[in-house]
Amino acid sequence: MKWMRHVALATALTLSAPAGVWADTPPDQLVVGLSMNNILTLDPAAISGREATGVIANLYDTLVELDAVDKTKVNPGLASSWTIADDGAVTFTLREGATFTSGNPVTAEDVVWSIKRNLSLGLVGAGVWSSFGYKANNIDQFLSANGNQITIKPAQPTDPQLTLAIFGKPDASAVIDKKTALSHETNGDQAAAWLKINAAGSGAFSLTRWSSNEMLILTRFDDYWGEKPQMKRVIYRHMPESQTKRLMLEKGDVDVAIGLSVPDIAALSKNPEVEVQRTPSSGFYFLAVSMKDERFKNPDVRLAIRHLVDYDGINKVIMPNYGTKRLRPVAEGVIGSLPDPDYKVDVAKAKELLAKAGYPDGFSVRLLTLNEPPFADTATAIQATLAQAGIKAEIVQGAGDQIYGPMRERKFEMIVGRGGGGQEPHPHSNLRALVINPNNADDAKLSGIIGWRTSFYDEQLNDMAAKALVERDHDKQKAMYEDIQKRYEELVPALQPISAVVDSVVYRADVKGYQNHYGWTVRLRSVSKQR
């Protein structure tokens, strides 16, 4: 197809680029090249996306840490231990001696305040809590501190293992230094303005400098309670262009490169001076429409679009090193996960459906996408196949908030995006992000839930997911999650997964201890340089 030829030409040009001359970054500093377009804030309650989560995971701690390799394993964090009661309540015991970078001790009060703050602000991180029934006006009934212990009771029937996992997610449960934060409160904002550009955590590193879309510098916290960081400093440098990151890595100006294009990863994989780490991540690359739009309320229009995406071609040409083909809203390998449906491009069928819906000549639509790989290439591929049925897609590219902002406000038409949970090895993690929508009203403002953003709502699916979550019989639960995926497909939802996210990170061969994380919480305290 025409779009494939364009991608192939770009690949050939990139692979032919000459390598630079190697230099060395300082032995006690880790320099990371990545796009900072989606790092819009440093407030844990407001972050979203891989890059911002990775930064926050090094500035703040959580009560537990989800193991980077074994998805079924939960490790101690600020909590040294925990117990799960028969009624599903989880009680954490704080470790002794942990302090914030300010020197203030980490207390149970800090933990409780951080969670209540998250809910009261109602930003992205609150979406996780609200999907489990916790609200700003009811959290006092379920969350409490007693000495060095924190207890959370279930607000609604749920799997306690998922409750436990929430406390390993920085966006939901990063522990903030209450005393320091409130000393910078303005007009009762709970330090929202200050924490947007500052940090008050107990993580392995402290914030030294942040220049938006330029540079972010972290400095080792020498009194860190856990494993002492090997690096004195971590420097994130804004590099939205893949070839720039590749050349800087080859020259030795950066140690780690995140978000490289497929051609650049392919070229670097042949270089003995670097290593490529490919790890399963979480979430999906997807195409979504807004069901607030009259055209996309019609299931025939949505079904037509399903027939106008070249899933095989996109995954073969664009997605290697970014993702692997996945068309279901549940990650492979979890309980009840179904094989992919056999969706193919069928222009004739799409035209028939559009005519039935009242659009025999198609229509025009704005297609939002980030201006970086693989989003822009995927949007171009979709634009080409949509055009075959008369749908004229105008691609609008931009940085993070320019693209995801309209989606969070439910003021978009069509978008190529990335997301969808999966930070916990459980189908509910994906369903919570993509399928379940507790309240479809505009004023619900559930901006952390993609189902709400797309205005997709099905009461029956909500009920099915709630019942599957609490089913303790393995075979019954498996069948229930299979039925959920079948109904989702039948409804022709507003969001169609295209590819399951794979994280490919390239780093200098002398960098040791770097470990990608499926939940994006890449902690850098274990990283060293072998020179």
Go through each PLM region and give its residues.
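Alpha-helical secondary-structure segments
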Residues: 31, 107-114, 147-153, 203-204, ...
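N-terminal lobe/hinge region of extracytoplasmic solute-binding protein
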Residues: 33-86, 116, 123, 198-204
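A structural "hinge/loop" feature
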Residues: 37-53, 75-78, 104, 157-174, ...
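Gly/Pro-rich hinge or "lid" segments in bacterial periplasmic/extracellular proteins
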Residues: 68, 168-228, 233, 347-348, ...
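Aromatic- and charge-enriched surface segment that lines or borders ligand/interaction sites
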Residues: 80-125, 151-153, 245-248, 295-297
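Surface-exposed binding/hinge segments that line
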Residues: 83, 93, 130-183
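Ligand-site clamp/hinge motif
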Residues: 193, 221-267, 383, 392-394
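Detector for C-terminal structural segments
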Residues: 211, 215, 308-336, 371-383, ...
